Amino acid sequence: MGIMCSGDVSERMNKTIELLKEQFLSIHSGRVNSGQFEKVMVDCEGASVPLVSLASIRVLNANTIVVTPYDSALLSQIDRALRNVPNIGTPGNDGECIKIVMPQLTEARRHEYVKQARVKAEEARVSARNIRRKARASLDAMGLAKDEIVRREKELDKLTKDVISVVDDLLRHKESELLRL
């Protein structure tokens, strides 16, 4: 049956939305978010280990996050990894935990982040359209009756429109979050 299993197409469209949500979490909006640190990898004895498996990450207030290692011997490696994360404040190591005070965003920086969000949203839209295009191509290759092809293409178009609508809603929400002072 190929790519045209409606569940497969729907699943791929949902993955596009989930990826966009993850990407939006990594765009700093003026408030700290523990999601910004989920992808941070720590060099630990020659292996890259996710920060979330080595330390607790706690939001202290709107601008401060506290990273407390489960093993205090890993404090310096975690500190080093956090210093390599772009767009966060300088980590402050007090010997037990690491506090990161996120800098306030300037108006220019907020607009730069809005542009990044728009680029990510457009990439998600393009991805949804590419999934639709591939599904249509597999429909044509299936040799179905013309009316069945038309019916499935309408379903594809509706699914694609719905996904793009969700992408647009996520973008609007992220833009308002970024531009709110």
Curated annotation (Swiss-Prot):
Entry's Gene Ontology cellular component terms: cytoplasm
Sorted UniProt keywords: Cytoplasm, Protein biosynthesis
Subcellular location: Cytoplasm
GO biological process, one term: translational termination
InterPro entries xrefs: Ribosome_recyc_fac (IPR002661), Ribosome_recyc_fac_dom (IPR023584), RRF_sf (IPR036191)
GO MF annotation list: ribosomal large subunit binding
Similarity section: Belongs to the RRF family.
Protein name: Ribosome-recycling factor
